[in-house]
């Protein structure tokens, strides 16, 4: 049975949601450490110091601050990302004059992923804003930048809406787009290139779970090495906007370089690299297997 575009989009969306869930459940503690170290590099000497201080100050739950919005963010982002990825693959086929069922090259898949990420950024930005603020709430309060308040998802959402209205949820959108669009070119490019390496002449669809996870991890490494400084700037903009200071991408970049040096743009890189392999490996494993399961069910039906 040949699926219509609506059914195919629904399958890609559902598989993307499964991948996003797996990604968060696998890598959330490392993401929390990353955001803390990006936003307050002077407070932590490194990953181990950040972990120990977080545990002593807030307990084990401190590693999972922002998990609810992170789940929402990743499910929303990856649902839209993979749904649009399938659509953008068709657009690339039309642009280069290929048949609708033709296999794309690794470079063409990378371009499709880059285009798709622009749509995903629109749903990711609001939820990631809430996540980043929750993850750094303790540091913001103890440093005196904001008054002590209730640290829940709902309280953060209400505060953003009260201060800035609906558009307040898009603090850091330009830096999010600047991270996502080039970043996902390397993400999907690295993933597809790695899958081609493991397939070595066979179909990529025949790859087992270990090559899939390694390919996903390699894609994640490629993404973060390419755009990590932009992610650091984005975290600063989204967290420090709590104080009412609205600084843009360029001003934030210049301020970090002038006051802290260029190395500050790489604060938190270690937990990000550690997280990249298991989290992105789990993402693609869940995506590929759930998508294959649904496609098989559709063909049988």
UniProtKB/Swiss-Prot annotation:
UniProt topology in membrane: Multi-pass membrane protein
Pfam families according to UniProt: Mito_carr
Start and stop residues of the Solcar repeats: 7-91, 104-197, 207-293
Transmembrane parts of this sequence: 5-25, 68-88, 110-130, 168-188, 207-227, 237-257
Chief location of this protein within or outside the cell: mitochondrion
Tissue expression pattern: Widely expressed, with highest levels in the liver, testis and kidney. In the brain, expressed at high levels in the hypothalamus.
Catalytic reaction(s) noted: L-citrulline(in) + L-ornithine(out) + H(+)(in) = L-citrulline(out) + L-ornithine(in) + H(+)(out); L-ornithine(in) + L-arginine(out) = L-ornithine(out) + L-arginine(in); L-ornithine(out) + L-lysine(in) = L-ornithine(in) + L-lysine(out); L-lysine(out) + H(+)(in) = L-lysine(in) + H(+)(out)
BP-aspect Gene Ontology terms: L-arginine transmembrane transport; L-lysine transmembrane transport
SUPFAM superfamilies reported for this sequence: Mitochondrial carrier
Modes of activity regulation: Inhibited by pyridoxal 5'-phosphate as well as by mercurials (mersalyl, p-chloromercuribenzene sulfonate, and mercuric chloride), N-ethylmaleimide and spermine.
Assigned keywords, A-Z: Antiport, Membrane, Mitochondrion, Mitochondrion inner membrane, Repeat, Transmembrane, Transmembrane helix, Transport
Location(s) in or outside the cell: Mitochondrion inner membrane; Mitochondrion membrane
GO CC annotation: mitochondrial inner membrane; mitochondrion
InterPro entries, per database record: Mitochondrial_Carrier, Mitochondrial_sb/sol_carrier, Mt_carrier_dom_sf
Top-rank taxon: Eukaryota
Signal peptide: none
GO MF, one example: antiporter activity
Function, in words: Mitochondrial ornithine-citrulline antiporter. Catalyzes the exchange between cytosolic ornithine and mitochondrial citrulline plus an H(+), the proton compensates the positive charge of ornithine thus leading to an electroneutral transport. Plays a crucial role in the urea cycle, by connecting the cytosolic and the intramitochondrial reactions of the urea cycle. Lysine and arginine are also transported by the antiport mechanism. In addition, catalyzes an electroneutral exchange of ornithine or lysine for H(+), a reaction driven by the pH gradient across the inner membrane.
Entry similarity comment: Belongs to the mitochondrial carrier (TC 2.A.29) family.
Protein name: Mitochondrial ornithine transporter 1
Organism expressing this protein natively: Mus musculus
């Amino acid at each position: 049975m040949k699926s219509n575009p609506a059914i195919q989009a629904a399958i890609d969306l559902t598989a993307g949601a499964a991948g996003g869930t797996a990604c968060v459940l696998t890598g959330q503690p490392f993401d929390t450490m990353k955001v803390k170290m990006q936003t307050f590099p002077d407070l932590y000497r490194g990953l181990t110091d950040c972990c120990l201080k977080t545990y002593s100050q807030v307990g084990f739950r401190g590693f999972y601050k922002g998990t609810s919005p992170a789940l929402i963010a990743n499910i929303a982002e990856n649902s839209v990302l993979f749904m649009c990825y399938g659509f953008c693959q068709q657009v690339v086929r039309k642009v280069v004059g290929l048949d609708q069922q033709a296999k794309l090259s690794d470079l063409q898949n990378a371009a499709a992923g880059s285009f798709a990420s622009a749509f995903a950024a629109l749903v990711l930005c609001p939820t990631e804003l809430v996540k980043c603020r929750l993850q750094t709430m303790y540091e913001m309060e103890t440093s005196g930048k904001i008054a002590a308040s209730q640290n829940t998802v709902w309280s953060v959402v209400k505060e953003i809406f009260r201060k800035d209205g609906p558009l307040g949820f898009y603090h850091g959108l330009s830096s999010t787009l600047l991270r996502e669009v080039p970043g996902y070119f390397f993400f999907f490019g690295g993933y597809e290139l790695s899958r081609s390496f493991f397939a070595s002449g066979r179909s990529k669809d025949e790859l087992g779970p270990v090559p899939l996870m390694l390919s996903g991890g390699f894609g994640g490494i490629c993404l973060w090495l390419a755009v990590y400084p932009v992610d650091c700037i984005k975290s600063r903009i989204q967290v420090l906007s709590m104080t009412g200071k609205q600084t843009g991408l360029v001003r934030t970049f210049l301020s970090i370089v002038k006051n802290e040096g260029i190395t500050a743009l790489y604060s938190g890189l270690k937990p990000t690299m550690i997280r990249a392999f298991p989290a992105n490996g789990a993402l693609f494993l869940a995506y590929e297997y759930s998508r294959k399961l649904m496609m098989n069910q559709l063909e049988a039906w």
